[in-house]
Amino acid sequence: MHDKFISREQAQGDLLSAAAFLAENIRSADGHAEAMNVIVPLYLAKGDVDLAAELSNQIAEPFARDKLLMQIAEKCAELDDDEYAVQLADAIEEHGLRAQAIEHVAQVKAAKGQI
């Protein structure tokens, strides 16, 4: 079993934390991945890339996990956390998605004139 990142107390504090708490406790691998595919982008919108990455790493299904890690890497590049963006891209298992993540990071940096 994986670690829980949202406590019951946190879940009582706001709706997104409650949703994440419930999603962390879904036992079906497919159900867990589907729930996190909705929740992680909401944490990204708030700029909470660390929690988004931790929640994504819990996903057992590699393709779903890799797709979310790609989104998080791109968000890190937008936030100028380039080292973390590269680290997340490197953590992607599927070679094609890893290359796509690196491309997205590079596109963000190029658009900002930082390459």
Positions of the model-derived regions?
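Non-catalytic tandem-repeat scaffold regions and their flanking low-complexity/translocation tails
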Residues: 1-115
